[in-house]
A protein has these predicted regions:
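Membrane-embedded transmembrane alpha-helical bundles that form the catalytic cores
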Residues: 1-527, 531-578
């Protein structure tokens, strides 16, 4: 029984564990009791917020231990600063203070190793990180239980730091008024369904809900259950199975697998990370909805995107909206460059690229994450420039690039893996561009649905492959010790590029399909379901929600039994826990 109330870093409260659902059942029982018996409507709301904040803090303690103190400090700090912003004659100074405090903590815990390594590389020194918080903790414990030579990243700090920054910024902009009760504000910051892995809930989206009475219709209950079951299926059947049975093996030892296997691992990793992250979000949305709270949508079938810009409008939407509202637009959006008049295309491209770099660093303190963010930024810029070109110019430039690559190959006989990959990619894009150009010439005189469908499918395929390739750097930098992340991540990425660029053997494709048939089938099934029309998906959600309660219970039991058949021996944590 004592284990329920003690922190165990090896057993955090995960949505896929029985312990979480036991915790939620107890919390929900208390929640229902409060909503039925706690006096007036205002008293019920106040009691509900305090109760759920206490439950959320317990949840975070079970997930991150003593780092609950960091969450408490951030809560108190931003609450007090938020009170001062509308009262002060210089509100911007208070906003700057809030942002500086929040980002200082984020930089300390997340980027200390990254910038220390840069400093050592530049100046040839051997500076080591020092955990000042562990040092202070040892002063109170008298037994030196905390390691001072290692900085541990608190779970979810990137998410709740961005939330409190949005709170101060929204007050400054006049979008919301400061929360007058510290406990209500603490509830907003720490609401447990989305605390450790999002979605990032901006203050203007959630604070008004603090004062709305609980309301849950029969249909909303069904929708909430649907999202929970949908998330569990995504996480356990798709994400975990693909990871354990194929993806992790390839990324751990890329040189033991052929170029095709490495390439297919990149494609399946795109499915894994989507199923994992959107699965968490689905469960969070469902759990929150059962308590009458609405969390923002975080994914909108991102692999239907026709270009990188559209992808980032559909993927991790809460982060994309945050970056747009608090980074891209303050930088000037598509209006200016360094405060001076500039072309719309140039300024928007610069700001987009810088925003993607920041987004890459938000995910992790490694050069691989910087490269990942930069690649996405470059992809967006190229696509913007491409779409701004005349159709004839597009084809001519693509033809010239292809001819140049072929001539360079003949003259240099290059054997660099990355060059090989670029050459293949250019040839494929040229072939697709040629087909598109012929179709465009024909379609300029007549409308053809088939040509339009092929054009759309080609754009979707190109975007999916491009995004999957950028994730080579994302995945290789994940789940690593921050002290050695740069070196290990770069080695993995380099090995995979070598294999994909040089060790390609078509003869192993069919044996591979036979050996990993369940992996291939799950990947294909996942993509087909993902590409289903949104209209159809909405219909089967509503159909599920409209079922009689006994049938919903039976469906839930069936899903749990099915998921149990796929569950792995070692529970896989959610990918975005590390961010």
């Amino acid at each position: 029984m004592i284990e329920w109330f003690t922190y165990d870093p090896a057993h955090p409260l995960l949505f896929t564990q029985f312990y979480f659902w036991a915790f939620f059942a107890i919390v929900y029982a208390g929640f229902a009791l409060i909503m039925q018996r706690a006096g007036s409507s205002r008293a019920r709301l106040h009691a509900r917020n305090i109760y759920l904040m206490a439950a959320s803090w317990f949840f975070y303690y079970k997930t991150s231990g003593i780092f609950l103190l960091i969450l408490a400090f951030i809560t108190i700090s931003d609450f007090l600063i938020g009170q001062q912003i509308p009262r002060s004659k210089r509100p911007k100074l208070w906003l700057i203070l809030s942002v500086c405090i929040d980002l200082s903590l984020l930089f300390y815990f997340k980027y200390a190793y990254f910038f220390t390594n840069i400093f050592n590389d530049v100046f040839g020194t051997n500076v080591q990180v020092f955990d000042i918080f562990a040092f202070i903790g040892n002063g109170f414990s008298h037994d030196g239980r905390f390691l001072v030579d290692r900085i541990i990243l608190p779970v979810g700090i990137s998410f709740y730091i961005f939330q409190v920054i949005s709170y101060a910024a929204d007050i400054y902009r006049g979008k919301i008024k400061p929360v007058t009760n510290l406990l209500d504000f603490g509830f907003y910051v720490s609401f447990f369904p989305q605390l450790v892995a999002g979605p990032i809930v901006r203050a203007s989206e959630f604070v008004p809900q603090l004062y709305k009475p609980f309301f849950l219709t029969r249909r909303q209950f069904g929708i909430a259950v649907f999202w929970i079951l949908n998330g569990l299926l995504k996480k356990i059947i798709l994400s975990d199975y693909l990871a354990v049975n194929f993806i992790d093996r390839v990324f751990q030892s890329p040189m033991l697998f052929s170029g095709f296997e490495n390439f297919f691992a990149l494609l399946t990793y795109s499915m894994q990370v989507y199923a994992d992250f959107s699965g968490y979000t689905d469960i969070a949305i469902g759990v929150a909805l059962l308590m009458g709270f609405y969390l923002p949508k975080n994914f909108d079938s991102p692999y239907k995107s026709r270009n990188p810009q559209e992808f980032w409008r559909r993927w991790h939407q809460s982060l994309s909206r945050w970056l747009k509202g608090y980074v891209y637009i303050p930088l000037g959006g598509n209006r200016t460059l360094f405060g001076r008049p500039a072309s719309k295309l140039l300024s928007s491209n610069f700001n987009s690229f810088l925003t993607m770099l920041i987004g890459g660093l938000w995910h992790g303190a490694s050069w691989n994450f910087v490269i990942w963010g930069a690649l996405n930024g470059v992809g967006m810029i190229i696509n913007k420039c491409w779409r701004a070109m005349n159709e004839h110019l597009r084809y001519v430039l693509m033809l010239l690039l292809t001819v140049s690559m072929v001539v360079a190959r003949q003259l240099t006989n290059s054997a660099y893996p990355l060059i090989n990959m670029i050459e293949v990619w250019v040839l494929i894009v040229w072939a697709g561009t040629s087909i598109w150009y012929i179709g465009w010439l024909w379609g300029a005189r007549t409308t053809n649905r088939f040509i339009a469908w092929v054009d759309n499918a080609w754009d979707v395929l190109q975007t999916f492959v491009f995004i999957s390739f950028t994730r080579l750097f994302f995945r290789s930098a994940s789940n690593l010790d921050p002290a050695t992340a740069n070196r290990e991540a770069w080695a993995t990425a380099k090995q995979m590029v070598n294999q994909i660029g040089c060790a390609w053997d078509n003869s192993i494709i069919w044996p591979f399909m036979q050996e990993y048939k369940y992996v291939v089938l799950l990947f294909v099934a996942g993509m087909i379901i993902h590409w289903l029309p949104d209209r159809f998906k909405r219909r089967y959600r509503l159909w599920f929600a409209a079922m009689p309660l006994p049938l919903i219970v039976l469906a839930a039991a069936a899903v749990v039994l099915l998921a149990y058949q796929f569950i792995t021996a070692d529970m896989q944590p959610f990918i975005y826990f590390q961010f």
